[in-house]
């Protein structure tokens, strides 16, 4: 019986199975032992197999056979990968881990065959993983050198640093002198290029300078600016040894060690304190200006009260605007879109937009020439965004009347190319405009639309909506009242009620969708 201090290691559950297997393979132990020696090229004169507690001599370093050890294994310490070793190979004292019944019968454990010691196969192209394959049905523990689990040597990609000779080159215009020490470069720039005369305007002519020739009104400002090129940081923190190019930055940094925050917010009721005046100024703007920090990307109208929130937005959406782009936007600002009103023609007047019903996406009756399942892509509504805001529903596009606006189905990724409106069983103009109908039919069809994007028609009475639909011509006599659902799944264009409408395509009524221009990065 096992004691509580001794780990079980699955010995109680597999004792009987292991004993039966060892009895069956007992007679084949000697044959397997010699076959293993022939495979490894070793010579062994002993007819009896090795002791149960010792692994095969070919896989442990034997001082008698140093030249006969397989070259695939090194002199590193052995690693046992077996989770439940069937033999006593993993015993620390070399004794057998068999059950007391097997030890009393004198049964010997089966020796591992040559198949059990197959070499490891690593996956090519995966240097960071330690994937290996163990032979199935192995009878013994697999011993591997510890060096097998060391990753292959990686080429350390160091950050590209400029050579010292290139760093100590004066990049002033028409200079290019070399220096051995940084202080020599700093003295050279200060003495020969930074002129003490005020008439020189203290202009920086360093190669690649972001100021583009703009000068300074004081010599000390010019000297501080030159440190950004020479990388000179003469002011060092005595606590953490950080260096700074400006003395003011060192003073602000020292406050992080002392905890001093002398700058208090002047807003009444706000007692926030800051270690520098710049942070206090940014905070004060949040009290007097409504979200002063805004995104400068054209078309993005996000504003924030904190500059860190704006930086997170720019990083998340990639709305980086360079200095040159900001100057171009100031010279030629983008036109602002007109505000939509119920009486203006900024939205598409009288245009029917066809979208797939959710039931059509999951295997409804297919349209002629329409591949199913449909890819998750939006319809191409670029042709609908050409309204210029004309009154009376006119001027939607050049050469097109106000109530006739063809859908651009040729560029639609949902439809095969070439695919026109004829594949829907309708001519091009049959998708647009309204038709004469009764007020009751319009109200009945309105309830059959599954969803409304923007309720712009709520500003008008039902009588005005009906009169507006009657004023538009009806090509081919198609009853397209606001809210009418077209049964396009069968190929015809007859109006259907929700009870008899099969899962197909849905037509959004005019006036319920507002098309807004958007800038996509």
Curated annotation (Swiss-Prot):
Entry's transmembrane regions: none
Chief location: nucleus
Biased composition (Basic and acidic residues): 455-470
GO biological process, alphabetically ordered: cell differentiation involved in kidney development; hematopoietic stem cell homeostasis; kidney development; negative regulation of DNA-templated transcription; negative regulation of smoothened signaling pathway; negative regulation of transcription by RNA polymerase II; nervous system development; positive regulation of DNA-templated transcription
Effect annotated for changing residue 290 to A: Impairs C-terminus cleavage
Low complexity compositional bias, start-end: 84-100
PROSITE patterns for the chain: ZINC_FINGER_C2H2_1, ZINC_FINGER_C2H2_2
Tissue expression from the record: Expressed at high levels in kidney, and at lower levels in heart and lung.
Zinc finger (C2H2-type): 168-193, 202-229, 235-257, 263-287, 293-317
Region Disordered: start-end pairs: 41-63, 84-110, 436-501
Site (Cleavage) location in chain: 287-288
GO cellular component, one term: nuclear speck
Composition bias type Pro residues, residue spans: 49-58
Polar residues bias: start-end ranges: 487-496
Region annotation Transcription activation: where it falls in the sequence: 71-137
Residue ranges of the region described as Transcription repression: 148-171
Domain of life: Eukaryota
Keywords: Activator, Cytoplasm, Developmental protein, Differentiation, DNA-binding, Metal-binding, Neurogenesis, Nucleus, Repeat, Repressor, Transcription, Transcription regulation, Zinc, Zinc-finger
Entry's free-text remark on domains: The C2H2-type zinc finger 1 has a major repressor function and is required for CTNNB1 binding.
Role noted for this protein: Can act either as a transcriptional repressor or as a transcriptional activator, depending on the cell context. Acts as a repressor of the Hedgehog signaling pathway. Represses the Hedgehog-dependent expression of Wnt4. Necessary to maintain the differentiated epithelial phenotype in renal cells through the inhibition of SNAI1, which itself induces the epithelial-to-mesenchymal transition. Represses transcriptional activation by CTNNB1 in the Wnt signaling pathway. May act by recruiting the corepressors CTBP1 and HDAC3. May be involved in neuron differentiation.
Protein family per UniProt: Belongs to the GLI C2H2-type zinc-finger protein family.
Name this polypeptide is given: Zinc finger protein GLIS2
Lineage: Eukaryota, Metazoa, Chordata, Craniata, Vertebrata
